[in-house]
Regions:
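Tandem repeat scaffolds
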Residues: 3-167
Length: 167
């Protein structure tokens, strides 16, 4: 099995809001590498086995994307939307997740190990068997897991400054 590596030029045409549109594409096994990945829309794209390797991902939208086995080797994700994204074995380990919205996502068996999670939402999520080992939840507002299914989720050696786990 040869590893497929895709290089994308982020100087492509932008939409009216200044976003590079990579929506509704099959980007399986692509490797996105660079300093900053910013203002990219991955709406409804297939991102299975994709690796993001960069210092920062900012202002990106992964709404309804398929993210099975995606690896985020990023120092920081900022203002990123994963609403209704679905995937297994997504790896966010050792990243700063700053203002990330995971609402209504299904991210089973995912890894949030040693993440710093700030001002982010996990409302109505299905996070079966995901791991938050040694994660820090730091927030001006409360971290929210309202109506989320946390069956078999591991919160081991976690620090939470303020949180909401209602219903």
């Amino acid at each position: 099995n040869e590893e497929i590596e895709c290089a994308c030029d982020f100087l492509m045409d932008k939409d009216a809001q200044g976003y590079t549109d990579l929506s509704d594409l099959d980007l399986t096994s692509c490797h996105f590498k660079g300093d900053v990945i910013s203002k990219v829309s991955f709406l409804s794209s297939n991102l299975q086995h994709v690796t993001f390797e960069c210092k920062e991902i900012g202002d990106c939208n992964f709404t309804t994307a398929t993210v099975d086995n995606v690896i985020f080797k990023c120092r920081r994700l900022h203002n990123v939307i994963f609403i209704k994204a679905s995937g297994e074995y997504v790896d966010f380990s050792q990243s700063i997740l700053d203002t990330v919205d995971f609402s209504r996502s299904q991210l089973t068996h995912s890894n949030f190990r040693e993440c710093q999670i700030r001002n982010s939402k996990f409302n109505n999520c299905y996070l079966y068997a995901s791991h938050f080992t040694r994660a820090e939840f730091l927030s001006d507002k409360e971290i929210s897991f309202i109506k989320s299914n946390l069956t078999a989720v591991v919160f081991d050696h976690v620090r939470i400054s303020t949180g909401n786990f209602k219903d």
